[in-house]
Amino acid sequence: MRVTLREIAKVADLSVSTASRALNGHPAISFDTSNLVQDVAAKLHYKGVKSHKRMNRANPLFGRNIAVLTLGMHRTLSALPAVASAIHGVEDALTHAGASVQLAHVPDLQQIPLGLPLDRLDGVMLVGAMQGTLVADSRGPILAELKKLPTVWILGRPAGCWGDAVVANDYAVGGMAAEYLARKGHKLLAFVNPKPDHLFFMRREDGFLSAARRLGVEALSYCESPPEGWSLPLKPPLAVETVQTLVDRVLASTPRPTAIFAAADSIAAQVYRALSVRGLQVGRDMSVISANNDQALITALHPHLTTLDVHAHEAGRQAVRHMGMRLMSSSGKSTSDVELMVEPTLVEGESVEDLRTNASAK
């Protein structure tokens, strides 16, 4: 007996109209729902399920030429787990939608990569260096060309640039870090950041300090760039000396903070090292919390790091969904830029001491 759309909707616990739109790749349907319906259809041997192209023809991204570019970033930065995860999310979603995808790494914004068919692109998904206004100030020729195209930035839009963006709610990241530390009884907190002008980290710092004030705890910022500063192509903070200097300043403070919020997991890994060099143990002598949930960077850390997951892969998928909705308009452009936020969630480890428990034990 032939399987009907109504049967698929019943198994997926969805309305028939939602199941139909999911099978046809409608951009208003979430990727999770779309994948659920596709899986149910495949298991029930729904006729036509083998033809993904036919099912996706209603998707505004079907057959479109979309470029995914990293701008002004060193390969060591684009290889960081959060960045790579976001790009993978974009790739997966574009492929699922039936788009033609072209990837390009553009560290030098004064050069337009050979073979990049700018005149044949329908849209661009961009990941840019978020340090100050370095990208916008470069005034590279590629920026002028990309600005002509429908644009969605992944994870964040560099200061002074154009286009829509799907970002992590970095202000909330900072606020949640402060709230968690306060709940654990910490009353003097430190924010450690070797990239003071980094847009993500500035937002996290603002959220951290604001929440600390609201909660009645004190928070101090320890932010300083390495002597050579930052330039394009931007690299991650690899100089251990800079983080060591910042951690030493935290340790020398009187009174001394009991907890550090590292601006990102890559920085937290260096904070662990800096504390170890001084003979201190994370979770006992100093508590540490961070953000991104970069498992490839933090899996080996002991004790396991408490961090805020920014859901980079989902941000990439949502960016593609937004591009599809943008292309549904006649021009693919808007009179105003739009920024969509993905909310963070806490991933609890053992790196934060519960001072309330210790106080009651005494």
Predicted regions and their residues:
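N-terminal helix-turn-helix DNA-binding module of bacterial transcription factors
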Residues: M1-R57, R356
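Short acidic/polar active-site loop segments enriched in Thr and Asp
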Residues: S15, K47, R64, D122, ...
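Flexible loop/turn connectors
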Residues: Q244-K362
